[in-house]
Amino acid sequence: MPGPWGTVYFLGTAQICSFLSSRWNLEGVMNQTDASRPLNWTIRKLCHAAFLPSVRLLKAQKSWIERAFYKRECVHIIPSTKDPHRCCCGRLIGQHVGLTPSISVLQNEKNESRLSRNDIQSEKWSISKHTQLSPTDAFGTIEFQGGGHSNKAMYVRVSFDTKPDLLLHLMTKEWQLELPKLLISVHGGLQNFELQPKLKQVFGKGLIKAAMTTGAWIFTGGVNTGVIRHVGDALKDHASKSRGKICTIGIAPWGIVENQEDLIGRDVVRPYQTMSNPMSKLTVLNSMHSHFILADNGTTGKYGAEVKLRRQLEKHISLQKINTRCLPFFSLDSRLFYSFWGSCQLDPIGIGQGVPVVALIVEGGPNVISIVLEYLRDTPPVPVVVCDGSGRASDILAFGHKYSEEGGLINESLRDQLLVTIQKTFTYTRTQAQHLFIILMECMKKKELITVFRMGSEGHQDIDLAILTALLKGANASAPDQLSLALAWNRVDIARSQIFIYGQQWPVGSLEQAMLDALVLDRVDFVKLLIENGVSMHRFLTISRLEELYNTRHGPSNTLYHLVRDVKKGNLPPDYRISLIDIGLVIEYLMGGAYRCNYTRKRFRTLYHNLFGPKRPKALKLLGMEDDIPLRRGRKTTKKREEEVDIDLDDPEINHFPFPFHELMVWAVLMKRQKMALFFWQHGEEAMAKALVACKLCKAMAHEASENDMVDDISQELNHNSRDFGQLAVELLDQSYKQDEQLAMKLLTYELKNWSNATCLQLAVAAKHRDFIAHTCSQMLLTDMWMGRLRMRKNSGLKVILGILLPPSILSLEFKNKDDMPYMTQAQEIHLQEKEPEEPEKPTKEKDEEDMELTAMLGRSNGESSRKKDEEEVQSRHRLIPVGRKIYEFYNAPIVKFWFYTLAYIGYLMLFNYIVLVKMERWPSTQEWIVISYIFTLGIEKMREILMSEPGKLLQKVKVWLQEYWNVTDLIAILLFSVGMILRLQDQPFRSDGRVIYCVNIIYWYIRLLDIFGVNKYLGPYVMMIGKMMIDMMYFVIIMLVVLMSFGVARQAILFPNEEPSWKLAKNIFYMPYWMIYGEVFADQIDPPCGQNETREDGKTIQLPPCKTGAWIVPAIMACYLLVANILLVNLLIAVFNNTFFEVKSISNQVWKFQRYQLIMTFHERPVLPPPLIIFSHMTMIFQHVCCRWRKHESDQDERDYGLKLFITDDELKKVHDFEEQCIEEYFREKDDRFNSSNDERIRVTSERVENMSMRLEEVNEREHSMKASLQTVDIRLAQLEDLIGRMATALERLTGLERAESNKIRSRTSSDCTDAAYIVRQSSFNSQEGNTFKLQESIDPAGEETISPTSPTLMPRMRSHSFYSVNVKDKGGIEKLESIFKERSLSLHRATSSHSVAKEPKAPAAPANTLAIVPDSRRPSSCIDIYVSAMDELHCDIEPLDNSMNILGLGEPSFSALAPSTTPSSSAYATLAPTDRPPSRSIDFEDLTSMDTRSFSSDYTHLPECQNPWDTDPPTYHTIERSKSSRYLATTPFLLEEAPIVKSHSFMFSPSRSYYANFGVPVKTAEYTSITDCIDTRCVNAPQAIADRATFPGGLGDKVEDLSCCHPEREAELSHPSSDSEENEARGQRAANPISSQEAENADRTLSNNITVPKIERANSYSAEEPNVPYAHTRKSFSISDKLDRQRNTASLRNPFQRSKSSKPEGRGDSLSMRRLSRTSAFHSFESKHN
């Protein structure tokens, strides 16, 4: 059943089968009961029998996609070793529908297979063995959900080994994609990563620009992760611009796509959710892609299926040719090349290679580097663009590209650095990093193919520029091929910077071919670039190339084909080839009037016929030889003239155009390429004429488009183009008038030989360009033309009338010399008469076959006086004019002609009035004969105007003449008067009819006076308003006629139902309703009495007519009629008139000036005498023409030019052209200045500058950070060097065995800025020969002040420690005191004052005996602070310790004081004891001190609350101090109480520590830093002066406790820029689990006092590097070096380095952090250790 009925049958049966299948579940027959099976079986058989032909037809018509593409599915289950529930393909075993797993086979069919389970697991899953091909079941359209509007994308599921030619056919044929001009393949990381905001913006903008300008395809991975997500964001940001323009194709593995089941279906539209499941390993597709190719290899959740398919597809696309179009092959021998009419040779535009491919690398993993190597090794190699700064692989490639040398070599030091970077970036082992490094170096061997884009670099400001530059470098093509590639991309910036460079070699003709391609593809910038680089348009443009440009199908749509069809007056075949002859006819049709195109002139048509005619049978018809000849008798003469035309076909210039920019501009205008037309307007000569011609052509095409019912947008666009060119003409005229008035007037009047021998004024009138005519320059010229050679400015009308009525008064008038009017126009005939005596005859124009003998016989009148050139009197500018010349010039002035004609016309009207008002006699009277002669001579004048008009053909002359409104009315009036005159000469009753016609005819002649009023400045605009209102009233009359007839017909039919057929019915319909409009309502006839007889008052009875049926309706409809007609429509007409008035009023001045030109031209061409005397002027003109014909040969002048123009020599013409070009340059210069000074442009420039400054500031900040990082690296290396030197010194000391007292003669001046962590550790505590060190640890409360303690960069907790040392000090009670040095705020050292200071101020509270004073020592310059710690021999018992001072180890307690004397020997006794007799020292454990009293350091805080545990950190650590091996400090003599040691503070560091307290069982996280780093004996520096007066020291009681943190610039730098140090915890001692009793504490105190040894302060040194308790030190990183330097400079000027700085923190914040921390969360503990 073929045909449409078969289709209906198929569809109908399909619906039935579908219903039955769903109703009875035909697919599940096996699941049905036995009772239902027979019915189902019967239905199935019936459906099968009915559908068998339809199913076969369906299979035959199977879609091409199903036949060409396949999918892959796993058909063998091999469990994975990692997950036994999954197959090696990635799917669950249960998802293998309909398959028998291998394990099941072994379990259920043991007889068939005896393999073990291990054998099955050892079998490797492979795509070729364990997958099966089947036709694809997923293709169609995706509708992405979840956005504001759903995006759509085409998709298809294909096998991973699909042939690339099938995919390309799918994209170009099925998906209707145009072959790309560039393929951008984006590679990068698949994991999500963040780009810098600025880099992301530049990346997205550049990628979109590269794709939009070149018509590129973008290949990505398709999924919404990693770099693909950033590509999608870029497409999303430009969605409004790029919709339908950018083709983004995602090639993704089918197995990793989320929601695969939603995409299954054949040629379907599937909604797709873009929300990804965070628990799933699959990913969703990116919604901003336009197409998806899903590669299927049978796996699920695994990448890699698309790699091979994507690379093969890119390779195949790169082999495709781009931009191939049908171009004729043109030979230089134009007589032999015209073979393109029969066949067309294909000449591809652009390179002879395929589609260029470029790889774009953004971020990425190690596999991306392998992909880059594969691209570089391909044949031909694919250029790669690397986006530096995006991270990982991109940065490594950029680094290798920057520092590698030719051949892939790199410096050894950089090689190690790069290997370390690879290890850290990809978490690789050394071996893996080396392998990847080898791949990287292989890539660097072809580094010329790699382009690195660095944001902000001078070479690559945009990434699109980097992409295209890389393609040019990698293409390895010739210069013409590179230019064609840039032309296809439309990237003139690439061509200018990369192709047109110095030293580039260009083959002959290559640039001309590029010019042709640029013109066809409408690439204005390339045309400009080619012209700048030496392409000669004169040599380039030939007849054949111009014709090819008119026949191109590229570029914007245009109406040229429709115009040619209108001109040819017939349908054209689809493959019709437009010739230049057709173009000439179209131009003449659009320009209208008498315009004559060069393409239709005899010379060009003969040349065209000789070149192309023999190869073209219809050449003669196209040339128009037969059609254009007006008279039959002239054909023989015309053909003879054709043979006489001398054309040298061997001349190479014969095929070129003298003004190529003219021809190209007209081509651009007709092809609707506005930008190209504007460009060609700027080049070449006669710019003003070109602008006016373009204005007229666009306006005419817009009119044609609106007449042909085309889309309104086309007409509006063409009108807009016309206004643009018109504005250019006016602005150029204004510019030239400002520079030189006379040359500007010459521009308006000189003859344009290339534009139908017209003038700019004539072209402006033809284009109806009112603004151009109304310009001051044009009006001044018209005024001079109007006055002729008369010099009159005031009362010109009265003077002219007086001269006409009294001719002797002419001699008193002033006249202008010829030199005063160098720009004055004249007729061609007069010009030739002036040239005859001076030079031999020269044919100025070619002859044309359309010259009419009648025109030659009539000739023309002298439109203007003959101004013969008098060489002898040129120097005398104001010479006297002869009387005869004055009379002649007077009567030939247009103003005189106007008044002469006006006076004659007024006399004619007076005589006409007399004729129609008086009795008409049998024969005409004298007055009547005068009127008849006036009309008759006026008719002859009208015939002369027609015959002497500019068009060549008689029919065209008539058409042009009838376009004038007054000419049409004059013709009607003359014909009507002629009819009346004929009837008047007849007998009665025709004589009366003639008289009536006279009476009617005079109405028009009165109206004709309005044309005369038009010359007046005030009356002229009103005349035009009347004309406009008349047109509006015509539309109103049509509407009024509808209303009037509706009422009139109804009224007439109701009131007069029994009328007979008559013409009176028409009159009766309109008569009364029409007069009702003006207020005559005929009240007596509205409701006349009718019906019964009426009795008057006098008793008489009046018989009334019977009432008409329905007569009562007439008043009702009359009321409605009057309401609509009198009120609504009349007021509507008034409103329309009002609108017209204001519309015309706004342009009335321009309209009047435009009409003034027409009036001036009319009287300029008229003879001197008015009708009826004009007959004498006609006779004179005939006589002159006959005489001229005798003196000239017939062939000398083929065309008669009757226009008024300025004829100038070639030198003057060149001068005018130069002046015009200067004006154009000045015009564009001023235009650019105005544009640059406009507010919008200034705002834009300012915005760009601010953005650039912002980018520069960002770059400066980045460089500053880079410099800081470099300085930090230098600091670290210097610290390491110092550490190395220290260790070397220690080693040398051990080797030489020198004593420290002899070797350490110089005090160390180590700066606190040392960044070596190990060195700082060694400088972290006191060290004495037999001394003890005590460290107090303080936990850092995060809620405390952040500016005091440095922030550790690690996640480890932090801890402070303070160093203590003990000296053998005895008071009166024999108590040994422990001296403590601790930190207040930032390393300020404070203790109580000495006892001497207490004595000086008795009112002050008591202070501890031990003092710590800080004094500057000018004799020993140091960048740090010298700290003097004093220990007094005596301690008065009457001085009680302060509550707010620190008592270490409970020294202030009575129990401790009582125990101390009995256990501790005195100082002198101790000194006399032998070492063996001294009390043994032991370490004090934590348990021994838990019961000691701990007091606050700060007066701002009271004692700790009882509920708060005093130890919130680790217990104080114990470190054994051994003899330092460093020789940097002096070894002191045994302990002397009279001398105080000097302590120097340096820096601190962190060390991580975690521990548990046995006392509390609470884990405490701590971090440690140390503060005291140096201590020397004061005997080296005159100790007596150092401790002269304790009260004068800053630490005295009489002084305020000073905070030295503000005067320590190095410490401030460390606090303001936190350092990051880390240490490992030291080994802790064993802690007791239970708290000790008070008795045990008392015993411990007693034991402690007995075991306190007198230390000998030798030096403050570091822990030895070999000590087991030394924490491991990591490198410290400083964040600000400049701030440290600045602070050093600021503090260098302070006289007292210990005074508080103004910039320090306010005192209101309280005491130091150390005090407050200890008061809240810390306590002291001490340890004792004796150095062996």
Swiss-Prot record:
Intramembrane segments per UniProt: 1074-1101
Stretch list, region Required for the inhibitory action of G-beta/gamma-subunits of heterotrimeric G-proteins: 617-625
Residue stretches spanning the membrane: 895-918, 926-948, 965-985, 990-1013, 1029-1056, 1112-1137
Membrane topology: Multi-pass membrane protein
Location(s) in or outside the cell: Cell membrane
GO terms under biological process: calcium ion transmembrane transport; monoatomic cation transport; protein homotetramerization; sodium ion transport; zinc ion transmembrane transport
Region annotation (Disordered) ranges: 829-851, 1610-1732
Effect upon mutating residue 205 to A/P/G: Reduces calmodulin-binding by more than 50%
Region feature Calmodulin-binding, mapped onto this chain: 192-215, 300-323, 601-624, 793-816
Effect of residue 200 to A/P/G: Reduces calmodulin-binding by more than 50%
Compositionally skewed regions (Polar residues) per UniProt: 1635-1653, 1690-1701
Subunit details: Homotetramer. Interacts with TRPM1; the interaction results in the formation of a heteromultimeric cation channel complex that are functionally different from the homomeric channels.
Function according to Swiss-Prot or TrEMBL: Constitutively active, non-selective divalent cation-conducting channel that is permeable to Ca(2+), Mn(2+), and Mg(2+), with a high permeability for Ca(2+). However, can be enhanced by increasing temperature and by ligands, including the endogenous neurosteroid pregnenolone sulfate and sphingosine-1 and suppressed by intracellular Mg(2+). Implicated in a variety of cellular processes, including insulin/peptide secretion, vascular constriction and dilation, noxious heat sensing, inflammatory and spontaneous pain sensitivity.
UniProt record similarity statement: Belongs to the transient receptor (TC 1.A.4) family. LTrpC subfamily. TRPM3 sub-subfamily.
This protein's name: Transient receptor potential cation channel subfamily M member 3
Lineage of origin: Eukaryota, Metazoa, Chordata, Craniata, Vertebrata
